Amino acid sequence: MQEKKMRILMLGNSFTTANHMPDMLADLTGAEIVQHTRGGARLAEQLNPKTKMGKRTLEALQNEKWDFVILQEMSNGPITSKASFLENAEKLCEKIRENGAKPVFYATWAYQRGGKKLETFGMGYDEMYQKMYEAYHQAADRTNALIADVGKKFYELSDRENLYADDGCHPNEKGSQIVAEVIAEVLMN
């Protein structure tokens, strides 16, 4: 008898889709991956039935079976809109569990140290990393969800490896490979 293929729904934005990261994740896990993404999307949009993406996500959670649903918030959303991030994370995790799936937070990273984007954001690298770390871990703790802490991995590697695209915000191909590896490790254990 053939083993059932793992099914993963990814909810996010360009940090999820950059460099075809879901394909990298599929290669590492053998899973079928469906993505509901839009550049700049926030988790709140995934819950809004009045948006095209929200309608698709809510229908997918109601009508399809998933093993894991991966949640990725807009790049600085966990800091700039923390209360909204936590509230929407809780609502999504509830819907994910009703589906029988496991929620997984894909915790993203601080903008590149010394980069224009970080300078414009008005926060130091270590401070942004710490605030992102705290927000994602708070969301995971509150919802008893898994966490793929990519932000921590970027923080550990950033002094020795370039993981960022030229904008100092998105991952380059190496960065996306790290994303896929960190998520795969969480899903496979």
Regions found by a protein language model. Give the residues of each.
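Catalytic His-Asp segment of secreted/periplasmic serine-dependent ester chemistry enzymes
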Residues: K116-K117, F121-N189
